[in-house]
């Protein structure tokens, strides 16, 4: 019975299925995962669009409002901002052509009277605007009756020059620019306004001058024209005479002060020391007559030194405490004894005796004997000029022995040369710099 009832029930259900539809809904467990993936893809597409268009669309489709420039990128500099940047710009009419860089240039000169109105100042026309090419940019204010301010040599401004009432400032400033350009064109030391010691070293020595160094390495200068030595550089004096530059006197004073401060305790060295340092230096060539004059003058000076030595010994100055003396040059000693009657008498007596004692065998003597005897007897005069044998020159070679014919009160044999050197030796380090800055040598 039960089976029949079940079979009957199935038949009824089958009949009902033919007329009715049943809808079954199945939930996908992966549905949430697919939704997340799709959302991420959509976000990625939006980011790509933003990178391609970084600015919003309103920026590209913005309405231009000429009245208000506060929200426009093209109106960042309006009339009020221009007035704030440069007060002098309010006098320039908007109708006149203005340089594009003149708007942002600051006001460098405030000499314009604030009470002047814009109507009294004529507006610059387009033909009066001139631009000068340079590295910097500036705008000159419109001043009336004022000359242009000179600029630095290395700073030439890019200026807009205006002409007022037919008067133009361009020729003056162009001349100034050309003058500055001329000063900077040449690097020649002869054209510089200020001569430095480095520039002086590059200049050639004048004619007849020679630069030498003593045993201590101190530089001095020899003038073969006047037979003098000096510490001063003759090239600086030549610059003063020729008149190149404006600040050369100051440069020479600074150079000499710096040089004298470092070597104030030094005096001029002797010629003999310089020749020992540089033996291969070419000596100046002189004629026979000039050499005879030099030999005669050296002999006279030697006799004067011997006379001075005898006077010092007779007066007792050698045994007493020795005060500091100045370095005596040959020319100063000559001036000191020029008015002495005893000295004049000795000169005449020596000239007569030299003529009487001249014999034929003196012509065959070696000239260097006289030079060696002179260098040994007189340590103060260190002269080493080359001598050429000549019959007329050798007639004075017996004069070094003429001190035996001097008056008896001058005891020359008792003289100690080492005690006398402290008075007359020029190359002594303790007496350097005390005497004159210019010394004569023969």
Curated annotation (Swiss-Prot):
Name of the protein described by the UniProt record: Yes-associated protein homolog 1
Location relative to the cell: Cytoplasm; Nucleus; Cell projection, Cilium; Cytoplasm, Cytoskeleton, Cilium axoneme
Gene encoding the protein: yap-1
A single GO cellular-component term on record: RNA polymerase II transcription regulator complex
Expression across tissues: Expressed in epithelia, hypodermis, muscles, pharynx, intestine, gonadal sheath cells, vulva, spermatheca and in excretory tissue.
Ranges annotated as biased composition (Polar residues): 13-22, 55-71, 108-120
Pfam families: WW (PF00397)
Gene deletion effect: RNAi-mediated knockdown at L1 stage results in vulva protrusion and rupture of internal tissues resulting in premature death. RNAi-mediated knockdown in middle-aged adults extends their lifespan.
Membrane spanning residue stretches: none
Description of how the protein assembles with itself and partners: Interacts (via WW domain) with wts-1 (via N-terminus). Interacts (via WW domain) with egl-44; the interaction may regulate transcription.
Keyword Cytoplasm: yes
InterPro entries: WW_dom, WW_dom_sf, YAP1
Positions of modified residues (Phosphoserine): 104
Superkingdom as given in the UniProt entry: Eukaryota
Gene3D superfamilies for this protein: 2.20.70.10
Similarity section: Belongs to the YAP1 family. Highly divergent.
Compositionally skewed regions (Basic residues) per UniProt: 1-10, 124-134
GO molecular function: protein kinase binding; RNA polymerase II-specific DNA-binding transcription factor binding; transcription coactivator activity
Presence of keyword Cytoplasm: yes
PROSITE patterns assigned: WW_DOMAIN_1, WW_DOMAIN_2
Positions of the UniProt region annotated as Disordered: 1-84, 108-136
Purpose of the protein: Plays a role in thermal stress response and in aging.
Ranges where the WW domain occurs: 203-236
Chief location bin: cytoplasm
GO biological process, one term: establishment of cell polarity
């Amino acid at each position: 019975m039960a089976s029949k009832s079940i079979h009957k029930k199935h038949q009824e259900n089958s009949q009902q299925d033919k007329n009715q539809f049943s809808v079954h809904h199945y939930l996908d467990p992966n549905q949430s995962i697919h939704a997340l993936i799709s959302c991420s893809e959509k976000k990625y597409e939006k980011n790509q669009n933003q990178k391609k268009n970084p600015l919003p669309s309103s920026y590209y489709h913005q309405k231009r409002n000429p009245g208000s420039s506060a929200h426009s990128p093209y109106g960042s500099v309006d009339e009020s901002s221009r007035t704030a940047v440069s007060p002098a710009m309010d006098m320039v009419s908007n109708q006149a052509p203005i340089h594009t860089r003149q708007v942002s240039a600051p006001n460098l000169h405030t000499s314009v009277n604030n009470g002047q109105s814009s109507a009294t100042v004529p507006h610059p026309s387009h033909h009066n605007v001139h631009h000068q090419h340079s590295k910097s940019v500036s705008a000159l204010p419109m001043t009336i009756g004022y000359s242009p301010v000179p600029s630095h040599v290395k700073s030439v401004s890019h200026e807009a020059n205006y002409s007022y009432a037919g008067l133009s400032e361009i020729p003056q400033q162009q001349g100034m620019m050309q003058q500055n350009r001329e000063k900077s064109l040449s690097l020649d030391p002869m054209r510089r306004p200020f001569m430095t010691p480095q520039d002086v070293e590059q200049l050639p020595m004048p004619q007849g001058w020679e630069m030498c160094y003593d045993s201590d390495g101190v530089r001095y200068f020899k003038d073969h024209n006047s037979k003098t030595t000096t510490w001063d550089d003759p090239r600086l004096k030549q610059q003063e005479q020729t008149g190149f530059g404006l600040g050369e006197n100051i440069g020479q004073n600074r150079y000499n002060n710096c040089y004298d401060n470092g070597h104030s305790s030094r005096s001029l060295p002797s010629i003999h020391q310089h020749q020992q340092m540089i033996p291969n230096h070419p000596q100046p060539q002189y004629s026979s007559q000039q050499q005879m004059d030099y030999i005669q003058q050296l002999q006279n000076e030697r006799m004067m030194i011997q006379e001075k030595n005898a006077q010092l010994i007779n007066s007792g100055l050698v045994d007493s405490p020795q005060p500091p003396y100045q370095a005596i040059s040959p020319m100063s000693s000559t001036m000191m004894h020029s008015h002495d009657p005893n000295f004049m008498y000795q000169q005449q007596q020596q000239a007569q005796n030299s003529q009487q004692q001249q014999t034929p065998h003196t012509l065959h003597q070696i000239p260097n004997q006289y030079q060696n005897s002179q260098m040994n007897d007189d340590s103060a005069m260190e002269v080493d000029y080359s001598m050429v044998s000549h019959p007329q020159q050798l007639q004075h070679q017996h004069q070094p022995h003429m001190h035996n014919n001097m008056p008896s009160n001058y005891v020359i044999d008792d003289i100690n040369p080492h005690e006398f050197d402290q008075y007359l030796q020029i190359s002594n380090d303790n007496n350097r710099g005390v005497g004159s800055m210019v010394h004569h040598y023969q």
